[in-house]
């Protein structure tokens, strides 16, 4: 299985002007933890890290420090996540039929989740890891008044990895570019192209580290893993 990791995010909500994946979590950059899970995965054979060239020296240092053994390529990202993933798709080895895309900021992902998604992708065209929503969700108008309360049993919170047939995802990206679609994940492109996307049970601990509170929670979860 081939894995693309978008890793170009700035840590503005962290109060930082540098790439948030280079911020430290238990003595290692966030990106290290994501890569360690990829290294331990039984299914992932190749990794592409999508970022900006000025971060590449630090990415290389991370790969050396954690003794990453799988083939890896550093790929220049675009102005948006969507553009970055498109660049990543173009850089995949020709042999790649299927691809997993995983946000580098979801640094608590486990090797098991990578492997389950990789296995499931052999039986479908597209999938995402997701968890059922526990909170009641409200839809509001521009004045912050509630318009509707959707049925919680139909709501799932999207995570990554998200996996797709490479040829289909390339077509979706090209169509999205031509029609000016702007989406926040690749599953949305698949949906707009009327293609099916399956849910794979994600992990509650697979949070996206975006704020200082997220960082503190991630630290707690990692410490629990090490003590058990």
UniProtKB/Swiss-Prot annotation:
CDD domains: CDP-ME_synthetase (cd02516)
Site, Positions MEP for the nucleophilic attack: residue positions: 152, 208
Coiled coil: none
Domain of life assignment: Bacteria
Pathway membership, UniProt: Isoprenoid biosynthesis; isopentenyl diphosphate biosynthesis via DXP pathway; isopentenyl diphosphate from 1-deoxy-D-xylulose 5-phosphate: step 2/6
One Gene Ontology biological process: isopentenyl diphosphate biosynthetic process, methylerythritol 4-phosphate pathway
Pfam families on file: IspD (PF01128)
Marked site (Transition state stabilizer) residue numbers: 13, 20
Catalytic activity: 2-C-methyl-D-erythritol 4-phosphate + CTP + H(+) = 4-CDP-2-C-methyl-D-erythritol + diphosphate
GO MF terms, alphabetically ordered: 2-C-methyl-D-erythritol 4-phosphate cytidylyltransferase activity
Enzyme class: transferase
EC identifiers of the protein: 2.7.7.60
Annotated Gene3D superfamilies: Spore Coat Polysaccharide Biosynthesis Protein SpsA, Chain A
General function of this protein: Catalyzes the formation of 4-diphosphocytidyl-2-C-methyl-D-erythritol from CTP and 2-C-methyl-D-erythritol 4-phosphate (MEP).
UniProt similarity note: Belongs to the IspD/TarI cytidylyltransferase family. IspD subfamily.
Record-given protein name: 2-C-methyl-D-erythritol 4-phosphate cytidylyltransferase
């Amino acid at each position: 299985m081939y894995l693309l990791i978008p890793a170009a995010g700035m840590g503005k909500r962290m109060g930082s002007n540098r790439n948030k994946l280079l911020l430290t979590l238990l003595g290692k950059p966030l990106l290290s933890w994501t890569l360690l899970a990829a290294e331990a995965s039984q299914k992932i054979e190749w990794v592409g890290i999508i970022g900006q060239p000025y971060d590449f020296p630090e990415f290389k240092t991370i790969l050396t420090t954690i003794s990453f053994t799988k083939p890896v390529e550093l790929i220049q990202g675009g102005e948006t996540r969507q553009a970055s993933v498109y660049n990543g798709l173009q850089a995949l080895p020709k042999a790649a039929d299927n691809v997993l895309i995983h946000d580098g900021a979801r640094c608590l992902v486990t090797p098991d989740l990578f492997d389950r998604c990789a296995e499931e992708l052999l039986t479908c065209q597209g999938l995402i890891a997701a968890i059922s929503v526990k909170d009641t969700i409200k839809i509001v108008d521009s004045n912050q008044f509630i318009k509707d309360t959707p049925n919680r049993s139909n709501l799932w919170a999207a995570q990554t990895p998200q996996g797709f047939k490479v040829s289909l995802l390339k077509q979706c990206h090209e169509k999205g570019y031509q029609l000016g679609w702007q989406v926040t994940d690749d599953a949305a492109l698949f949906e707009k192209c009327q293609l099916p996307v399956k849910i794979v049970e994600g992990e509650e601990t697979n949070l996206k580290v975006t704020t200082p509170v997220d960082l503190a929670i991630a630290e707690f979860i990692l410490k629990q893993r090490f003590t058990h």
